[in-house]
Amino acid sequence: MGHNQPMQSSNPQEHFVQIALDIEHRLTTPISLTSDSNQRRNQWVTIIICTILAVTGQCIARLLENYYFLHKNLSRRRGILTQTLLQVVGFPILLLPFLLHFLIKKQKQLLIFSGETSLKHLAITYSILCIYMFCQAFFSDVRNQIPYRVFTLTYTTQLLFTLIFSKYYNDIKFNRWTFISLILAVLAGAFTLYTFSAGSPIYGKKSYGYGIINVAFGAAIFFSLLLCIIRKVFEELISFCNTSTNRKQPSFVVVLEMIIFLSLVVTIILVAAVLISGEHHDMKKEMETFTKGDIAYVRTMVGQAVAWQIYWVGIVGLVFAVSAVFSNVISVCTWPIVSLLVAFLYNTHDHFDVFRGIALGAAALSVSCYIYIIHKEKSDDDDQSTS
């Protein structure tokens, strides 16, 4: 979970990016108390901003994905690797803030990829992300071959997997509020099963087998494992900075570093897969046959790439600032919002019903419970530091 550590910099402009994760018992001088108060406030601001980014990014990406499938004339089976590639190929937009940080701070080396974190965990992170992306590609192909309610119930299991992996990899302690939050998040995801798919248009019902369901389980497992391994890398970096006398606590820029380098490697692999499979020939055909025109096609693809990067900054930022569990809760609790927006924009005859209301209410309560957990932990830390 996210914790507090004294700030190493006195520049007020650095408060947003300087998010400490570890707790140490400090002397309760007026200066330290003021610093802790500012640090807590800035961490809350960061959590709020990352939550907004995660929700906004996922909503825009799914809406544009729906728009893409509604107006393409080619077979749905075409372009599955391309759609997966869009989730990572937009990373160059993060290079500008990343490089500006290095220029302004005059930083000479990377933090995560400079040998200060375990190469084993970095290798696992790369492997898990690659497997997850290919699962997403196959999952995109078979999603509508199973009833949407089956898909939703299967995919919400990622919350359970995140809970298990966080306990094993991150050694997180849970309380009753954690389980209440997760139960409400599962309900939020489960009650969207009575609505249509929030990521692509509905197709006719088809027979499905256990192999297809296993693909959905695989995507859920690897996404959960990915978040927990990323958290483990961040924890190792924090531990290194704590034991090193000449190292400041890592700032939010490590989130950009993590996303950029992971996306770079996966992009290269997926581009190679697209070229080998011949999907790059389909892109020109899709552009020519797109019912809204080639300009709309390009805007849709670019918009998805940018939206996914916004989503990843929010999700990985929440992993850095809080935990993998909270990050996944936010991801799942966005589904009812996406479902409502899709109904409003693409299916106007589909009215707001009791199931959508329950899903939205459960999502709001789930997030509120976890925010209460964070607030309570910080209050307990304050009591310990003043005692």
Swiss-Prot record:
It comes from the Eukaryota. It is a multi-pass membrane protein. The chain crosses the membrane at residues 44-64, 84-104, 122-142, 150-169, 179-199, 210-230, 252-272, 306-326, 329-349, 354-374. GO terms for cellular component: membrane. The keyword Flavoprotein does not apply. Its main location: membrane. The keyword Transmembrane helix applies. Keywords: Membrane, Transmembrane, Transmembrane helix, Transport. It is found in: Membrane. One of its GO terms (molecular function) is purine nucleobase transmembrane transporter activity. Belongs to the purine permeases (TC 2.A.7.14) family. This is Putative purine permease 15. It comes from Arabidopsis thaliana. The gene is PUP15.
